[in-house]
Structure formats: C-alpha cells, structure tokens
Amino acid sequence: MAPIRVVLLDIEGTVCPISFVKDVLFPYALEALPGTLKAKWDSPEFAPYRAAFPAEHAGSQESLAAHVRDLMSKDLKISYLKSLQGYLWETGYRNGELKAPLFLDVAPQLARWREHGGVKVMIYSSGSVPAQKLLFGHTNGEPSDILPWLSDFFDTVNAGPKQEKASYEKIAAKHQEYPIGEWLFLSDNVKEVEAAKQAGMQSYIVDRPGNAELSEEARKEHRVIKSFEEIGDL
C-alpha cells in the first residue's frame, strides 16, 4: 500500500452529522429564502445566482422559490441550487447563528496530519466550494476557523459528480505532484468510495452516528472506520 500524502474528505456524514445539513442548514435556507429574494431580487450581487437558474423558474420570486422548495424536497444535488444555498447560509454563519458541529475527532486529527505528517487535507463535497469554506470557517471547535488547515476544495462544478470515477481522476490531476495512489478519500457513501477506488485512490467508508446502515457486503468490500483516530498518523 502506498503512503498517504493527501486526505480528501467528504463533509456530510463524514466530518459533521448528516442532521446538521438536513435539520439545520436546509431549514435555515428555506426560511431565509423569501426575505432574501425580496431584498436582493434586482441587485447586482444576486444576479449571478438568479441567472444560473433555468429561465422558466427565474422569471419571478414566487417561481424561483417554488422551484427551490421542490428541489430541496427531493434532495437533488444541482449546482445552481447548491450555490444559492451557500449564499443564503452566509448571513447565518457570519452572524453566529450557524456553526458547523464537527465530530470530536475531526479537528485534532486534521491538525495532527498537517503538523506532524505533512499530509495535505482537501475537501470534496456536493455542496458548493463557497458553502464548504463557510462551514470550515465557522465550526464549533477551537479554533473555529480551520480553513488554513485545508489545501483545496472541490465540488460538482469544478470536479464533477461524486459517484463517477472521472471526478476523482480530475481532482488528482490538479495536484500531479501527488500520485493518485497516495490519496485517501473518506466518505460515508459506498458508491463514492467505489468510484474513488476505481480511479486509483485509497478509500475508506466512514460510519458515523445517524448515517445510513451499511450492508454486510459493503463492510466486507471496504475498510470501515468510525473515527479518524483509527487512521492514526500518516
């Protein structure tokens, strides 16, 4: 097994509970949406987010809001929705209403890898890169802002869908100084882990409280960890 020089992390169900996204972030975005649309609809600041939506849904505040509610009810991971969600969450993070509840092992282990092993830590999530940076810039730990510990960020726009092998190849190609076999991808999603492995990365399933139950087949096929501490020093 090649040494690990880059750890690539999923977010939801890996570094923080799925419930934070489903029960805190999503409702916050829905609650903030009507007021934001009313206040920002014609502003240059909001124009890129509005323009990214399909024309048939971007003609009125009511139409756009209805489309957002529909997409979120189906948990569809569409890039223009993810970008808008990040925009809506920004106010909540900045004013202290939102703080990302990282699992207790995450920040200490990230610091350990970075400081003692020289390992690069990067993020790959279906949430937009701006939303990722808001989350890691406003955690419930000390320090709250751990962005300086992270070397790069990937989403479905700059990398591609998370269940496709080509997305992991594209990510590794951006950092050619690290051979793809020296990357470790950690995720709660079995199909993402399989795609990363097909691309040539090492990959483990992270089994956190609140995550979907893993099949016996998945447990046999892949290494499963409950905490980053199980990985130890790299």
Curated annotation (Swiss-Prot):
What SUPFAM superfamilies does this protein's entry cite?
Answer: HAD-like
Q: What is its EC number?
A: 3.1.3.77
- Principal location listed in the UniProt entry: cytoplasm
Q: Which InterPro entries does the UniProt record give?
A: Enolase-ppase_E1, ENOPH1_eukaryotes, HAD-like_sf, HAD-SF_hydro_IA, HAD_sf
Name its pathway.
Amino-acid biosynthesis; L-methionine biosynthesis via salvage pathway; L-methionine from S-methyl-5-thio-alpha-D-ribose 1-phosphate: step 3/6; Amino-acid biosynthesis; L-methionine biosynthesis via salvage pathway; L-methionine from S-methyl-5-thio-alpha-D-ribose 1-phosphate: step 4/6
Cofactor binding: number and manner:
Binds 1 Mg(2+) ion per subunit.
Cellular component annotations (GO), alphabetically ordered:
cytoplasm; nucleus
User: Where does the record place it?
Assistant: Cytoplasm; Nucleus
Provide the catalytic activity annotation. 5-methylsulfanyl-2,3-dioxopentyl phosphate + H2O = 1,2-dihydroxy-5-(methylsulfanyl)pent-1-en-3-one + phosphate
Q: Which residues bind substrate per the record?
A: S125, S126, K162
Q: Which GO terms describe its biological process?
A: L-methionine salvage from methylthioadenosine
Annotated Mg(2+) binding lies at D10, E12, D188
Q: Which GO terms fall under molecular function for this chain's record?
A: acireductone synthase activity; magnesium ion binding
Which cofactors, by name?
A: Mg(2+)
Q: What is the annotated role of this protein in its UniProt record?
A: Bifunctional enzyme that catalyzes the enolization of 2,3-diketo-5-methylthiopentyl-1-phosphate (DK-MTP-1-P) into the intermediate 2-hydroxy-3-keto-5-methylthiopentenyl-1-phosphate (HK-MTPenyl-1-P), which is then dephosphorylated to form the acireductone 1,2-dihydroxy-3-keto-5-methylthiopentene (DHK-MTPene).
List the PANTHER family: ENOLASE-PHOSPHATASE E1
Q: Which family does it belong to?
A: Belongs to the HAD-like hydrolase superfamily. MasA/MtnC family.
Q: What is this protein called?
A: Enolase-phosphatase E1
The organism is Neurospora crassa (strain ATCC 24698 / 74-OR23-1A / CBS 708.71 / DSM 1257 / FGSC 987)
What lineage is on file?
Answer: Eukaryota, Fungi, Dikarya, Ascomycota, Pezizomycotina
**Recorded name of the encoding gene:** utr4
